[in-house]
């Protein structure tokens, strides 16, 4: 138990710190979503792990419930609360069920961060610039300044994200305001990770066949 007033760690570190595949995937997420470090990836992964753990417990209750396969009592209430929260934040669709929680990935959580939404709404040119605008107090939700890039944004609040009233960015002639939104940002079905992978594939130089032949032995 932590001391009163002392913040406890809100994430779990990887059990095996030197797994090459996991480390490469974390670096890819850090770059795609403009994260400060891997701790922000671990926070999202820990949140997802919590929801998936609750979903497994609920599905176990469904399996042990007999032929009806329906949750009753506080299990049904718990299921409704989890689903309604995930739907409210746009992490799952409105018609999703408990099974759909198990198919979620870390990027589904990262997509709902304020930093990601500022980029998708065309308020910043890059994901790094989106983070800068937020931390410098240029972004507001419902007119209130928001300075935490990692806060999760609900679907309702998403409609009210904009520049803060006294920010210089309120001027349409400001040089740092983006002119237009990229096409992949307007498509919410395409995650920033998928867009980054597609861009990397396009920029990768084609492999040349053959190569210079080695000369024969010494004369």
Curated annotation (Swiss-Prot):
Region annotation (Disordered) ranges: 193-219
Biased composition (Basic and acidic residues): 199-210
Keyword Protein transport attached: no
Domain S4 RNA-binding: 112-174
GO biological process terms, semicolon-separated: ribosomal small subunit biogenesis; translation
GO MF annotations in UniProt: rRNA binding; structural constituent of ribosome
InterPro entries: Ribosomal_uS4 (IPR022801), Ribosomal_uS4_arc (IPR022802), Ribosomal_uS4_CS (IPR018079), Ribosomal_uS4_euk/arc (IPR005710), Ribosomal_uS4_N (IPR001912), S4_RNA-bd (IPR002942), S4_RNA-bd_sf (IPR036986)
SMART domains cross-referenced by the UniProt entry: Ribosomal_S4, S4
Keywords annotated in UniProt: Ribonucleoprotein, Ribosomal protein, RNA-binding, rRNA-binding
Entry keyword annotation includes Transport: no
Disulfide-linked positions: none
GO cellular component: small ribosomal subunit
Subunit field text: Part of the 30S ribosomal subunit. Contacts protein S5. The interaction surface between S4 and S5 is involved in control of translational fidelity.
Family in the record: Belongs to the universal ribosomal protein uS4 family.
Function: One of the primary rRNA binding proteins, it binds directly to 16S rRNA where it nucleates assembly of the body of the 30S subunit. With S5 and S12 plays an important role in translational accuracy.
Name of the featured protein: Small ribosomal subunit protein uS4
Originating organism: Methanosarcina mazei (strain ATCC BAA-159 / DSM 3647 / Goe1 / Go1 / JCM 11833 / OCM 88) (Methanosarcina frisia)
Lineage: Archaea, Methanobacteriati, Methanobacteriota, Stenosarchaea group, Methanomicrobia
The encoding gene: rps4
